[in-house]
Swiss-Prot record:
One of its GO terms (biological process) is cytoskeleton organization. Gene3D superfamilies: Annexin (1.10.220.10). The lineage of its organism: Eukaryota, Metamonada, Diplomonadida, Hexamitidae, Giardiinae. The keyword Methyltransferase does not apply. This is Giardin subunit alpha-2. Belongs to the annexin family. Giardin subunit alpha subfamily. The keyword Cytoplasm applies. It comes from Giardia intestinalis. It holds the Pfam family ANXE1_4th. SUPFAM superfamilies: Annexin. Keywords: Annexin, Cytoplasm, Cytoskeleton, Microtubule, Repeat.
Length: 296
């Protein structure tokens, strides 16, 4: 990493020039933690908040919001997105982008940030808002606990038990399994499940679930295989939904540095670069291509 003072000076120059492409390039070079150090260095050097100066320099829109998010406390950004998705609106897509696309470490910090910002415990506030009548709500509560323990049986035995749960529509078992299985054990269980049933766990969801119940578990499947795989799926959803800039802001702003391999996982759906350029306008697309390092 170059000297912090030089990076801060480069950022100030880009802001003064209203050069959002250069701001995006600088952001793309560093992790979320490093970007926070840059924001602190900017504060120390100029006595101003970096996101505020980005806001003053640029011309609004999701592009401005995304670049501001990249130099803000990501845990506070996630907490705010969750709060915005609640408030009686229950934006299910936002829950996939913020609750499931999140590492356990980041979730712990987000919970603390939410309480600090809104004076309420996050999980309790979430469940109060969405209720407990639907399967996806109960699954989300288990997922947000981030309590995973090694499975007792072999992959083949666990696959047998899971298949039995599907045949009996045992929603509690299925949701507890998905919320509690360690990621490092999930892949082998999924492989055994395929050998046993002829389909993957993700395909089995479609046999008994629809709507948000289905998509919550489907997203969890990808998250357990690797956050970059979930990011690829969510980016594809955002592209297919008429270029959903709000979703791309959430996915990119909070997780791009942890999910850069998404562009490789995306090959299942096609070319991430081609889809981004096709689905987003001439202002947003180059920023997204820079941040995701889509150069092929």
């Amino acid at each position: 990493m170059p000297k912090l003072s030089q990076i801060v000076a480069d950022m100030k120059q880009a802001i003064d020039a209203k050069d959002e492409a250069q701001i995006a390039f600088i952001a793309s070079e560093y992790s979320a933690d490093a970007r926070q150090r840059i924001a602190q260095g900017y504060r120390d050097q100029y006595g101003k908040e970096l996101p505020d100066d980005i806001k003053k320099a640029l011309k609004g829109g999701s592009e401005e919001s995304l670049l501001m998010d990249l130099f803000s406390d990501r845990h506070e950004v996630r907490a705010q997105h969750i709060r915005d998705a609640l408030s009686g609106k229950n934006d299910h897509m936002a829950f996939f982008d913020t609750v499931i696309l999140c590492t356990p470490e980041d979730w712990h910090e987000t919970v603390a940030a939410y309480t600090r910002m809104f004076k309420k415990p996050l999980v309790e506030d979430f469940m109060k808002d969405v209720g407990r009548k639907e399967n996806w709500c109960l699954f989300m509560e288990k997922w947000m606990a981030h309590e995973r323990t090694s499975r007792e049986g072999s992959p083949d035995e666990e696959a047998e038990k899971l298949n039995k749960a599907f045949s009996e529509s045992d929603h509690d078992y299925i949701s507890s399994f998905m919320a509690g299985v360690p990621p490092e054990e999930y892949k082998s269980i999924n492989t055994s499940f395929k050998s046993l049933t002829g389909k993957g766990i993700d395909q089995a969801f479609a046999t008994i679930y629809t709507g948000t119940d289905y998509y919550s578990l489907y997203c969890a499947h990808f998250a357990l295989l690797g956050m970059h795989k979930l990011a690829a799926y969510l980016v594809n959803c955002a592209c297919n939904d008429k270029g959903d800039e709000k979703r791309m802001r959430r996915i990119t702003g909070m997780m791009v540095d942890k999910c850069l391999a998404a562009k490789y996982a995306y090959k299942t759906y096609g070319s991430m670069k081609a889809d981004v350029e096709r689905c987003f306008d001439k202002r947003m697309a180059p920023i997204l291509c820079t941040l995701w390092r889509l150069r092929e």
